[in-house]
UniProtKB/Swiss-Prot annotation:
GO terms for biological process: 'de novo' AMP biosynthetic process; IMP metabolic process. Its cofactor is Mg(2+). It comes from Salmo salar (Atlantic salmon). Mg(2+) binds at residues 35, 62. The lineage of its organism: Eukaryota, Metazoa, Chordata, Craniata, Vertebrata. PANTHER family: ADENYLOSUCCINATE SYNTHETASE, ADENYLOSUCCINATE SYNTHETASE ISOZYME 1. Disulfide bonds: none annotated. It is an enzyme of class 6 (ligase). One of its GO terms (cellular component) is cytoplasm. CDD domains: AdSS. This is Adenylosuccinate synthetase isozyme 1 B.
């Protein structure tokens, strides 16, 4: 478009077309309370991606990926790092615990991860998680337990305190660590002192920490880039497949989740723009990952929870134990109110439905289809936790298929009653299901379209 065309009679109010250019990002997000199997969907898409990004959270996420019979555990590294042909990006919205990053990489190196340093790009605007943030995380949990008789159930990875430092403008970023170290040291000491004033029992070995941080600075220096410019370049350069791997999930989002039992970042689609510094225009497909039943770690309202043999069966058959915490997960029936709510916020292109095979032994399967409050149906998902505790779930009963689906590789292989379950979810949420997972391995994801 010539300059002349842009500025013809500005008073005439001619609407200029927006430049719809550049590569689109494919986004994978959790649609429940986490642990939906996002790592598996990311792994599937990562094989053909050029760039794989993390945009929020820290090493509180837990993704397990199985490749060639080897199991890799990722917490902070994008799980696409196992793709040797792709670049992996840790965006500005991620909080980085440097010892955790290297520990995780070394652990995965033992399983065969190679040359990850050459493929990792770290945004210079990302905030740093210090050891004292992790210590404070633990102390705050103890405090909450003492004051309220309950805690949030954080992973004690320092995520919340780091985002608090960020919001109160006392945090330190990767760019600060790589700039004047004297200035960094002074700000580090001040931050440590602030926390010590709040928590008198907190011990911080300032000099020891700074010495380690100086070493980490040199190790990460080659990986650090201006994240905004890097993403702009990637979007506006030659055609590239860019994938964003969400951590946590919709109901753990700081704004839209079951507050206060949430994480400290936006794990919905808005967090992709703010956590990477990209325009909404460049967001392409947004895939929601949904487990065929519901699980939750820690406390907080859980309307479809089954504190009975159904819950126990799901827990044992599904091996529902947290990757990061090792805690048993609470289990219940699939809740479509949650999925509709997650879709209102994220606008999903399609769902990936995982762990369908866990339901193989059920005679009858229930699905939560709506909530009633004081006898009246409500069209929204309640914000207040006490209100959410009180909702009455209306269920639909579906017959179980009572046969092993773990060997199914295409839609036609699935029992008719399993097909009906899938269609039921699609119709009632209004989002198509693109993949169905029936096992741990890469091959056990049935692609529907």
């Amino acid at each position: 478009m010539s300059h002349k065309a842009c500025y013809t009679n500005p008073g005439a109010g001619v609407k200029r077309p927006r430049n719809d250019t550049g590569n689109k990002l494919t986004v994978v997000l959790g649609a429940q309370w986490g642990d939906e199997g996002k790592g598996k969907v990311v792994d599937l898409l990562a094989t053909e991606s050029d760039i794989i990004c993390r945009c929020q959270g820290g090493n509180n996420a837990g993704h397990t990926v199985v490749v060639d019979g080897k199991e890799y555990d990722f917490h902070l590294l994008p799980s696409g790092i196992i793709n040797s042909k792709a670049l992996s990006v840790i965006g500005n919205g991620v909080v980085i615990h440097l010892p955790g990053l290297f520990e995780e990489a070394e652990k995965n190196e033992k399983n065969g991860l190679k040359d990850w340093e050459k493929r990792l790009i770290i945004s210079d605007r990302a905030h740093i998680v210090f050891d004292f943030h992790q210590a404070v995380d633990g102390l705050q949990e103890v405090q909450r337990q003492a004051q309220e008789g309950k805690n949030i159930g954080t992973t004690k990875k320092g995520i919340g305190p780091t985002y608090s430092s960020k919001a109160s403008r006392t945090g330190l970023r990767i760019c600060d660590l790589l700039a004047d170290f004297k200035d960094f040291s002074m700000r580090f000491k001040n931050l440590a002192q602030q926390y010590q004033a709040m928590f008198p029992t907190l011990e911080v070995d300032v000099d020891g920490q700074l010495k380690k941080l100086k070493e980490y600075a040199e190790r990460i220096r080659p990986m650090v880039r201006d994240g905004v410019y890097f993403m702009y370049d990637a979007i506006n350069g030659p055609p590239k497949k860019i994938l964003v791997e969400g951590a946590n999930a919709a109901l753990l989002d700081i704004d839209f989740g079951t507050y206060p039992f949430v994480t400290s970042s936006n794990c919905t689609v808005g967090g992709v723009c703010t956590g990477l510094g990209i325009p909404p225009l460049n967001i392409g497909d947004v895939y929601g990952v949904v487990k065929a039943y519901t699980t939750r770690v820690g406390i907080g309202a859980f309307p479809t929870e089954q504190l009975n043999e159904v819950g126990e069966l799901l827990q044992t058959r599904g091996h529902e134990v947290g990757v990061t915490t090792g805690r048993k997960r609470r289990c219940g029936w699939l809740d479509l109110v949650i999925l509709r709510y997650a879709n209102m916020i994220n606008g999903f292109t399609a769902f990936a439905l995982t762990k369908l095979d866990i339901l193989d032994v059920m005679d009858e399967i229930k699905v939560g289809v709506s909530y009633k409050l004081n006898g009246k149906k409500i069209p929204y998902f309640p914000a207040n936790m006490d209100v959410l505790q009180k909702v009455e779930v209306e269920y639909e009963k579906l017959p179980g298929w009572k046969s092993d689906t773990s060997a199914c590789r295409k839609w036609e292989d699935l029992p008719v009653k399993a097909q009906n379950y899938i269609r039921f979810v699609e119709i009632h949420v209004g989002v198509p299901i693109k993949w169905v997972g029936v096992g741990k391995a890469r091959e056990s994801m049935i692609q529907m379209f």
